[in-house]
Amino acid sequence: MWSLHIVLMRCSFRLTKSLATGPWSLILILFSVQYVYGSGKKYIGPCGGRDCSVCHCVPEKGSRGPPGPPGPQGPIGPLGAPGPIGLSGEKGMRGDRGPPGAAGDKGDKGPTGVPGFPGLDGIPGHPGPPGPRGKPGMSGHNGSRGDPGFPGGRGALGPGGPLGHPGEKGEKGNSVFILGAVKGIQGDRGDPGLPGLPGSWGAGGPAGPTGYPGEPGLVGPPGQPGRPGLKGNPGVGVKGQMGDPGEVGQQGSPGPTLLVEPPDFCLYKGEKGIKGIPGMVGLPGPPGRKGESGIGAKGEKGIPGFPGPRGDPGSYGSPGFPGLKGELGLVGDPGLFGLIGPKGDPGNRGHPGPPGVLVTPPLPLKGPPGDPGFPGRYGETGDVGPPGPPGLLGRPGEACAGMIGPPGPQGFPGLPGLPGEAGIPGRPDSAPGKPGKPGSPGLPGAPGLQGLPGSSVIYCSVGNPGPQGIKGKVGPPGGRGPKGEKGNEGLCACEPGPMGPPGPPGLPGRQGSKGDLGLPGWLGTKGDPGPPGAEGPPGLPGKHGASGPPGNKGAKGDMVVSRVKGHKGERGPDGPPGFPGQPGSHGRDGHAGEKGDPGPPGDHEDATPGGKGFPGPLGPPGKAGPVGPPGLGFPGPPGERGHPGVPGHPGVRGPDGLKGQKGDTISCNVTYPGRHGPPGFDGPPGPKGFPGPQGAPGLSGSDGHKGRPGTPGTAEIPGPPGFRGDMGDPGFGGEKGSSPVGPPGPPGSPGVNGQKGIPGDPAFGHLGPPGKRGLSGVPGIKGPRGDPGCPGAEGPAGIPGFLGLKGPKGREGHAGFPGVPGPPGHSCERGAPGIPGQPGLPGYPGSPGAPGGKGQPGDVGPPGPAGMKGLPGLPGRPGAHGPPGLPGIPGPFGDDGLPGPPGPKGPRGLPGFPGFPGERGKPGAEGCPGAKGEPGEKGMSGLPGDRGLRGAKGAIGPPGDEGEMAIISQKGTPGEPGPPGDDGFPGERGDKGTPGMQGRRGEPGRYGPPGFHRGEPGEKGQPGPPGPPGPPGSTGLRGFIGFPGLPGDQGEPGSPGPPGFSGIDGARGPKGNKGDPASHFGPPGPKGEPGSPGCPGHFGASGEQGLPGIQGPRGSPGRPGPPGSSGPPGCPGDHGMPGLRGQPGEMGDPGPRGLQGDPGIPGPPGIKGPSGSPGLNGLHGLKGQKGTKGASGLHDVGPPGPVGIPGLKGERGDPGSPGISPPGPRGKKGPPGPPGSSGPPGPAGATGRAPKDIPDPGPPGDQGPPGPDGPRGAPGPPGLPGSVDLLRGEPGDCGLPGPPGPPGPPGPPGYKGFPGCDGKDGQKGPVGFPGPQGPHGFPGPPGEKGLPGPPGRKGPTGLPGPRGEPGPPADVDDCPRIPGLPGAPGMRGPEGAMGLPGMRGPSGPGCKGEPGLDGRRGVDGVPGSPGPPGRKGDTGEDGYPGGPGPPGPIGDPGPKGFGPGYLGGFLLVLHSQTDQEPTCPLGMPRLWTGYSLLYLEGQEKAHNQDLGLAGSCLPVFSTLPFAYCNIHQVCHYAQRNDRSYWLASAAPLPMMPLSEEAIRPYVSRCAVCEAPAQAVAVHSQDQSIPPCPQTWRSLWIGYSFLMHTGAGDQGGGQALMSPGSCLEDFRAAPFLECQGRQGTCHFFANKYSFWLTTVKADLQFSSAPAPDTLKESQAQRQKISRCQVCVKYS
């Protein structure tokens, strides 16, 4: 038992010990003791288990003993509960750079980068290997056969025919026999015999010269494809233009100077050597200049370097830290008076001052000129200006030899020559003489008859000539001819040939290509020093120099006490000049200097003979006629080599030939040319030259078209000038005239210089003549190259020369006509055979030979030189339409459109908010009638009373009888016009009416008569009338919900209406109740006569309203009463329900023409009309002036000719048929079109149906669409002059250009002008009338750059510019000085006097500006003086009859209105949450607009903007609108990852960060308005809209926006009282983050917005909120609290 007790004690002790560490130890111990001892268990044994053997004395309790020693340490207790989180520590120091992190996820795709700069041109590559032989080309078509040429000239005389047969034997003569007759002496030569009979046709003469090329024939059918032709000769090119100069190379070290003696023999230039080995490294260069200070931010602190070597002992350290604080010193003297403090902050706003005195405003003074705008971009090259006035006469030009001009036109045929002298008579018996000189050519014979048509064989002999073909178009130039034979070998002679006589001066040649570099010349004498060149670019930095020897250790420096930073020193003296820079690149060519004065005559010295020149090219053959253009026949076979011709006259020097192949040098001793001697004196004048030969006759000009016959003139009076005829077709060329070449005439006197020409086209100008050699000038700066001038006008013909010496033998003339048959010759013996005759005329061209066989492939020719630069090609045809381009980036926001037409009636809206409590109502209307009283006694018949009040509306009667069926309803007479009613409230918009019928197409106009002549340009017309309004703009954005209006005052009751129509007599009523008994009963009397009317009784009291009677039977319809008098206007009625659409009415008579109304609201765009018929062809323009002759073409198609003078503008054609392109994007708003004319009257409406039940007329139908505009009325008479006010009116809008004036009378004929140069493009013609709207095309290419717009308004002040470059160092002397203390601030100066008012500036040009912002509400002005009475207006159209309304009683006085004065000065900020600017509420002027800034983050700290305050509406947007500055007076911009956050619009979320213009549609716009009182937001915390307090009105309703966070843990919030906490629209992502440094914006994933939620009132203090995730927009909105912004209005 004891053991159990001990065990229990131990257990309890252990339990108590283990629990004693807790706070409940006492209780547990007591509990445990009770558990042991108090368990109620009895121990069995004596004394209850106690030891009773010993006496138990209970002594008294002793006093408390001393405290025991401390017990041993207890065991460690269990871990305590975690404590609360401590406060955040201070921000730690910047840690070491961490290891590079893992690669992040791929970021969003960045925007496309800016295209790089174009790379430098590469080094030209080596020539490529020759390509493989190309495939044979396609077979060409046979060319069409040319027209037969003109008949050749008459052939030369054929050789004499064979002798004729012997004649018949003559009669025998008489025999005379004389004896002894001696033979007589030979008699005189007999007379020439009679001409013999014509001989037989001689053999064919030699072939005549080639005829002129015929006109091209009609295009024949394409021939069979020919075989492939032989390979052509390699083309001959021209050396290409010199390339751009290369980059300047590094400056080489100077080479050794060698003087080379001239060699004894010809030197040859060797081949280029191989590239040398790299040179040795040069000496170190001089030290470079100090570089410019770098740009960029200071870098991050670098990584600690390795420990350096032990340094020298340092100098004395700086003073130590200040010591401990000393003891309190003695009291000092009172200080001096302080300096005047700076100007204080501006004081609070004062009370409004009294209203100012109204002064008549003076004329507006012009403000000071604004800041200069930024320079605009260079405009495009302007149009060519008009020709300047004629310049002064220039000096006579010097004649220089130029190139041979093109062949002149064929001259007119010469006159027939004089008959030759008679020849010596021939002897019949002599041998035939030598052939005589060819006779002069005879006159041309008459043209032969037209031959028969030829046969159609392709290869055949020449057929008979065909009939005259129609004149063909000018054919293309022929291709390049075959390569000519190789010329004769040139002579090699070391001596130059004798100098030929000088040729006549040629025309100026074109500028030759740049020649090769000449041999190096001798060193010239030292020239005068040139002017200083332009400053070259800085040289490249020098290489690092070799390290110098270590310097000696410097002396120990003085100890510097001051630690104040000194001021910036002054600029030091200029350093020594730097090393010369690298040579600059070539400057551009300078302007040509003016012609210098002639120099003084040079000293004469014998010139050393110059070196031998290269052999000159052979001159062209002398005076042959001009070569005709190439013919169209096939090339003939090469002829045999002819005999060498007679040497011709020395030809004019031809143009420089192409550079030949490298020649073989013939070894001969060549001496280096000596130096040029000084110019010799002028020689004596040479003898007078022989007269020059007369030029060959030119081709004949083409005849013009025959003009139209003029009107027959009268005998004396000259008729009016006739119409100008069209230019005729060119006539056929006449026969070539003959005339011997005349002697050359003397040179003509120099002509007067022509006027200065318009600058010519640089591609076609000629090189001017070389000037006389002037003195060597100082080399000028090379100017830009000028444009070559036009050739001068042709000088007048020279004085005719003296008769020249006998000319050389003329050329062989053309064959003459066959002579008249001569008399028969004497019979004589057959002569000896004659000398062979001259070659015959050339025969007709033979048929083309058969195509030859394919030749052997030719060797690859050497590469030809580059061809000349081609002439500009013709403009290509317009390309096919490309596919539609990608949509462009959104354009900038356009101006506000015109107000759109009212939209159709929308569906019924949600019920509105409960209105504000109304004012106390007026007394109610009369009550219902009381119960029926007892019947009274029957009274006497009263006199008729006054007209009673209008009875209550009777009950609806029974349906009437069926009316008769009207066959044709006649139109009633129109009623008298009622007075116009007051304007009702605007009704709901009716449904859109049916569109009108399509108008008929108009007839095409006829041609007008031709004008007499081109009129002078009319003067500028008066500005036209303003056009009609343009088409409606696109629908504007939805406006703000309007504020609920104030309750209107109760309207006055209307006046009583006119009497109604007489009612139909009712049926007899039922029998009345029985009356009371009478006092006396008399017998009934006979029926009396009707009594006379009694006097009117007194007014009885108004009886109570009777009960409505029982409905009587339907009476017969009454006649219409007379029209009532018009009552006063009634109050506007409530809006009726829209009536059913009525049947269309009959067509009314056309009304009188109304005055021109104000421009209406633009109607909706009409249905696209049908395509117009194609317009008639316009009249032919006047024939342009004849263009100058073009240069010969190099290829098949010549260059485009110069642009002719534009013809007169043709009549305007009708619109063409519509294009087939799909509609393009909507164009910009076009200019208003002219008003349409009235359409034809519509067809008569359908006959109405027969009425069965005549219902009450329905309410009026909806208003139909507006009709077409009527034609413009005639302008009214001029109005009366207006009164002259003190204020000057604003300048009117710029007028439209007036119509062109009528043609003026014909001017006098002008003098013949010199031929002008090619004209430039004409100026832009006047703008035509706007055509009808065409179909939408594809999006066009970007338009030309527009004209510069008007200068914009002055922009806001820009951001501070970057810090300027450091100034030049100041001059300092050697003594450093401690800077002085800053001076005391000066006293504030007195206020300057007001300046004198400036002169009034001139009125600025320009059209009327845009309307300015609304000004603040001004004080009521003094009433103006009454204006002059206007003239009586025209009668208006008949108005609709107004309904008569009864006049109401006078209402109670209204509440006191706002007096004039200012608003309260409170600011209200509206954020649209779209990209459109919000509008201010009614009566609140707008102060500015801008972009909605939510908050900024800089240095990872956020700064919030309250959206209800004006600071959240920044006028200008920037992704980083701030910079940060530090104590070192340095500011940094865009150097850290700072951000800005802006309220966003409703644009769809983008996939990539936005940049530049793409950001604009995503930023919300805002406006700051001036409000009369402070606006307050109220929040409901549920789905209902909270009401505004009494006497407050609503501004807008929205959703409760609470706070936001962005990058990191930074963000901000809105005060719930602020209007910024009530956003009109809920967005889960309501703001946009812009990364300032990158200039991009995006909706990033770590942005959160916080909104007040809805809370049910019964769950305010209940269980924890249930978590929820809302993904649908509607569910999100239902969870967000609603709010309303209110402002006090009374």
Swiss-Prot record:
For this chain the motif Cell attachment site maps to 94-96, 145-147, 189-191, 310-312, 724-726, 785-787, 989-991, 1212-1214
Is Transport there in the keyword field? no
* SMART domains membership: C4
PTM details? Prolines at the third position of the tripeptide repeating unit (G-X-Y) are hydroxylated in some or all of the chains.
Site feature: Cleavage = P1206, G1207
* One Pfam family named in its UniProt record: C4
Domain (Collagen IV NC1) ranges = 1465-1690
SS bonds (residue pairs) = C1480-C1569, C1513-C1566, C1525-C1531, C1588-C1686, C1622-C1683, C1634-C1641
Give the GO molecular function terms: extracellular matrix structural constituent; extracellular matrix structural constituent conferring tensile strength; molecular adaptor activity
Biased composition, class Low complexity, residue ranges = 76-88, 412-434, 644-655, 866-880, 907-917, 1108-1117
Q: In which tissues is it expressed?
A: Expressed in Bruch's membrane, outer plexiform layer, inner nuclear layer, inner plexiform layer, ganglion cell layer, inner limiting membrane and around the blood vessels of the retina (at protein level). Alpha 3 and alpha 4 type IV collagens are colocalized and present in kidney, eye, basement membranes of lens capsule, cochlea, lung, skeletal muscle, aorta, synaptic fibers, fetal kidney and fetal lung.
Q: Mind naming one GO cellular-component term on file for this protein?
A: collagen-containing extracellular matrix
Q: Where is the signal peptide?
A: 1-38
Please state where this protein is localized.
Answer: Secreted, Extracellular space, Extracellular matrix, Basement membrane
**Annotated glycan sites:** N142, N669
Locate the region Disordered: 61-173, 187-258, 369-390, 405-451, 469-1457
A GO BP entry: glomerular basement membrane development
Record note on domains = Alpha chains of type IV collagen have a non-collagenous domain (NC1) at their C-terminus, frequent interruptions of the G-X-Y repeats in the long central triple-helical domain (which may cause flexibility in the triple helix), and a short N-terminal triple-helical 7S domain.
Q: Which family does it belong to?
A: Belongs to the type IV collagen family.
Q: What does this protein do?
A: Type IV collagen is the major structural component of glomerular basement membranes (GBM), forming a 'chicken-wire' meshwork together with laminins, proteoglycans and entactin/nidogen.
What is known about its subunit structure?
Answer: There are six type IV collagen isoforms, alpha 1(IV)-alpha 6(IV), each of which can form a triple helix structure with 2 other chains to generate type IV collagen network. The alpha 3(IV) chain forms a triple helical protomer with alpha 4(IV) and alpha 5(IV); this triple helical structure dimerizes through NC1-NC1 domain interactions such that the alpha 3(IV), alpha 4(IV) and alpha 5(IV) chains of one protomer connect with the alpha 5(IV), alpha 4(IV) and alpha 3(IV) chains of the opposite protomer, respectively. Associates with LAMB2 at the neuromuscular junction and in GBM.
Q: What is this protein called?
A: Collagen alpha-4(IV) chain
